[in-house]
Amino acid sequence: MAMHAYGLSWIDEQRLFEVADHVFGKMLSARNGKPLPPDPFTLVAQAKLLDEPLQAIVDFDDLRSRNKSLSNAIGLWHQKVLGLSPRLTELGSNGGGVDLRTAPGVLLPMWEKPGYFEVKNRFNTIKASDEKDVWDKLKFLAQSNGAVSYLVQVIPGAREPYDRPW
């Protein structure tokens, strides 16, 4: 029996624990290192415009920064957890701009083709200026590999699951 039981039969639960420990441990150790300096101009302007004490704005900015670090870690965690599936391969930073692909020999049942996946934690994590690049990468991988590509949004913009062309 696994040392850590989460009720997920499709992945090795010990590896899930190790992934969580690694991703979030790395995030926490980075946060405990030397923090980036805040933008004093933005902080002063925000305090004046919102009529808030400067210290309250400084504290809020620190909390916002911590939240951003956590959000980024959660996005990476989702990618790595999905990569634990024996049917998927995590591509990491060498993935040609995408996060996952189906494991060798695995085909998507609906298409009978391999798949490539770009994983985003939330629907709004792609800047509008980057959407075309993501689209072009997914299209290129699909066309050049006889595959299907997906943009996976763990938290979509609406509260219903969907599978539709982008």
Task: Show where each model-derived region lies.
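Conserved catalytic cores of phosphodiester-cleaving nucleases, focusing on short active-site segments
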Residues: 98-126
